[in-house]
A protein has these predicted regions:
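SF2 helicase/translocase NTPase motor core
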Residues: 1-122, 162-176
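Secondary-structure boundary/capping positions in well-ordered alpha/beta enzyme cores
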Residues: 12, 37, 133-134, 156
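Flexible, glycine-rich phosphate/dinucleotide-binding loops
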Residues: 22, 144, 158
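Short, amphipathic alpha-helical segments that act as regulatory/interfacial helices
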Residues: 27, 150-153
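Conserved helicase ATPase motor motifs in RecA-like P-loop NTPase domains
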Residues: 99, 126-150, 163-164
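Conserved AAA+ ATPase "sensor/coupling" helix adjacent to the nucleotide-binding pocket
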Residues: 152-158, 174
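Conserved AAA+ ATPase small/helical "lid" subdomain
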Residues: 178-183
């Protein structure tokens, strides 16, 4: 997907994964496609709050890095990425192991309300800031509850009259009413 977009002139992409060790796999896979492996660059190479100075490439980071908030004069990692990509970005954002963003919308637990996860909220902030981005959710782990799918707003399941459900709350209600078969 990234290579297809690259060949169409969209020369910036973001790859978010659970572990920084997976960058070696990402570089190997990118190289196997005939591309320069060093074009896959870790966000950790750039200090938080400083500009990302890549003209093009695949920015690799972890969910733990993505959730880094503003710190004094240093902007959040989400803002740093958006500044690099530009608000009109229409390239690819890969959420590898996307289930790591589960509980992005919070919900109800056995002991009451459950706060939204920081990783999930950061993933949603990135998606909201880049409405034209081509978002890919990759996960072999199924959601255990419908609330855990709040991060996956780009699936087109809720969001207005052009979607099956007007809101995420309507989607959650319908799936919960349908039971296990609906999941």
């Amino acid at each position: 997907i990234i290579l297809d977009n690259w060949l169409q002139g969209r020369r910036k992409a973001v790859w978010i994964s659970k572990s920084d060790k997976l960058i070696e796999d990402a570089q190997r896979d990118w190289s196997a496609l005939g591309m320069e492996r060093l074009l896959v660059t870790p966000l950790s190479r750039f200090l938080q709050g400083k500009p990302i100075t890549l003209g093009e490439g695949v920015l690799f980071l972890t969910y733990a890095t993505l959730r880094s908030d503003d710190r004094g004069e240093r902007v959040s990692r989400v803002k740093q990425i958006v500044e690099w990509l530009g608000s009109d970005f229409d390239g690819v954002i890969i959420f590898d192991e996307s289930h790591a963003m589960q509980n992005a919308g919070g919900g109800k637990g056995e002991r009451g309300d459950v706060a939204p996860s920081q990783q999930g909220r950061a993933g949603l902030r990135l998606q909201h800031a880049l409405p034209n981005a081509r978002v890919v959710y990759v996960s072999a782990t199924g959601a255990t509850t419908v609330h855990n799918l709040a991060y996956a707003q780009r699936l087109g399941l809720w969001g207005g009259e052009d979607f099956p459900f007007a809101t995420r709350a309507e989607f959650v209600q319908a799936i919960e009413a349908g039971g296990v078969a609906a999941m």
